[in-house]
Structures are given as C-alpha cells and as structure tokens.
Regions:
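Ubiquitin-like/PB1-type beta-grasp interaction modules and other compact soluble beta-rich domains
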Residues: 1-73
Length: 74
C-alpha cells in the first residue's frame, strides 16, 4: 500500500488529508484520488519520498506520496 498525503488546494478539493491506495504507478494513483477528476489531479505537484517522479514511476510498498497544488509567486 502507498500512503498519500494531501496539501493546499488538493486537500481542499478532495476533502481528505490523507488516504491509502493500492496503485502500482503514479499514473494509476491519478485515478484513485478521492473526490477529484483525473484532469484536476494531473495539474498537481506529485512528490514521492520528497522528490518529483514521472507518471511511470512504480511504487514500492510503504512509499509516501505527497499531492499538492503548484506554488507560484512573484
């Protein structure tokens, strides 16, 4: 299982702070985020153990994923 934590607008949109899922890849995870459509999830920053990963990354049991809205400023 993969532990997923939500931050920022991602948390607000999904209505959850965290959840567990059985996705094997980031691409699969994008279809399992509660209360969010895939098109909304693909705009999020996806960090795996603190580092950005591709949609093809294969999870290992116990991985921790963070989903958060992009941060911008000026």
């Amino acid at each position: 299982m993969v532990q997923v934590r939500m931050f920022g607008m991602a948390r607000f949109q999904s209505g959850v702070k965290s959840f567990e899922c059985d996705a094997k890849t980031v691409n699969e995870l994008m279809n399992q985020v509660p209360n969010m459509k895939r098109r909304d999830v693909r705009d999020l920053v996806i960090l795996m153990n603190g580092k950005s990963v591709s949609k093809r990354y294969r999870f290992k049991d116990g991985d921790e994923v963070v989903l958060m809205s992009p941060i911008g400023g000026g």
